[in-house]
């Protein structure tokens, strides 16, 4: 064993002896008053002291780098929001353009349908007018033939029956004249309906005008029917009064002959 090792061994021996003596020594009881003083009072809460975090030695915290990274993160989030906004705006603009195209296409389809319906209605009106004209021509031709036949019959008949037939023909001619007058009045009041050049608003106004006109005609018809009914009632009342008065007049005209009424 070397001299250094012997010296260390000798130093360790007294230290071990002192530790054994300390363990063998009995612990002295602390006074009760000291223990009570050492207890924390319940009325005052104990606040632990604030200890600043320890920065490990050998490591350097770069606050500029932290700030730069945070700024880069915020900038990236802002750029993402901007990209999302412009993408959404582009999508909305595309939807708006598609909607406008659909509206224009639908408007063109409606215009084409309206043009087709107008053309069909014009053809139908032309056919109706042609059919009406053909029927009128046939009726006029038939009427002329009937008139020629009747005139021929009248010229061959005798004078006795000729006057009667002439009067009948004159009455019939008067009725035809009244019918022709009625047709003329209706043709004057019946205005042609030209709606080819009208737009949607003008058609709506025209329909409202026709509806108001129909209501007015119905009102006038109702008033005339009521007036006609009242006139018929007054005529019947007057006729009954005249009949009743004539009965009394016939009774008053009888005379008394030989004590008896005849």
Curated annotation (Swiss-Prot):
Keywords from the UniProt entry: Muscle protein, Phosphoprotein
PTM-bearing positions, type Phosphoserine: 2
GO cellular component, one term: troponin complex
Role summary: Troponin T is the tropomyosin-binding subunit of troponin, the thin filament regulatory complex which confers calcium-sensitivity to striated muscle actomyosin ATPase activity.
Family: Belongs to the troponin T family.
Name under which the protein is recorded: Troponin T, slow skeletal muscle
Stretches with biased composition (Acidic residues): 1-31
GO biological process, one term: regulation of muscle contraction
Biased composition (Basic and acidic residues): 32-41, 107-149, 177-197
Biased composition (Pro residues): 43-55
Stretches the record annotates as Disordered: 1-59, 107-153, 165-197
MF terms (GO), sorted A to Z: tropomyosin binding; troponin T binding
Subunit details: Interacts with TPM3.
């Amino acid at each position: 064993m070397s001299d250094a090792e012997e010296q260390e061994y000798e130093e360790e021996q007294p230290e071990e002896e002192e530790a054994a003596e300390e363990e063998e020594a009995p612990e002295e009881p602390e006074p009760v008053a000291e223990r009570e003083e050492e207890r924390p009072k319940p009325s005052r809460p104990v606040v632990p002291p604030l200890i600043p975090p320890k920065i490990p030695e050998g490591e350097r915290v770069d606050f500029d780098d932290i700030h730069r990274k945070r700024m880069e993160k915020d900038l990236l989030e802002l750029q993402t929001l901007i990209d999302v906004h412009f993408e959404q705006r582009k999508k909305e603009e595309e939807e708006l353009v598609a909607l406008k195209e659909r509206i224009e296409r639908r408007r063109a389809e409606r215009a084409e349908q309206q043009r087709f319906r107008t053309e069909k209605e014009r053809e139908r009106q032309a056919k109706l007018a042609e059919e009406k004209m053909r029927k009128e021509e046939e009726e006029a031709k038939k009427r002329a033939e009937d008139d020629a036949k009747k005139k021929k019959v009248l010229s061959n008949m005798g004078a006795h029956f000729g006057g009667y037939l002439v009067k009948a023909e004159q009455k019939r001619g008067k009725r035809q004249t009244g019918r022709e007058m009625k047709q003329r009045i209706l043709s004057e009041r019946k205005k042609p309906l030209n709606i080819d050049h009208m737009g949607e608003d003008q058609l709506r106004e025209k329909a409202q005008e026709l509806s108001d006109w129909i209501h007015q005609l119905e009102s006038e018809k109702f008033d005339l029917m009521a007036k006609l009914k009242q006139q018929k009632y007054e005529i019947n009342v007057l006729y009954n009064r005249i009949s009743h008065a004539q009965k009394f007049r016939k009774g008053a005209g009888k005379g008394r002959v030989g004590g008896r009424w005849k």
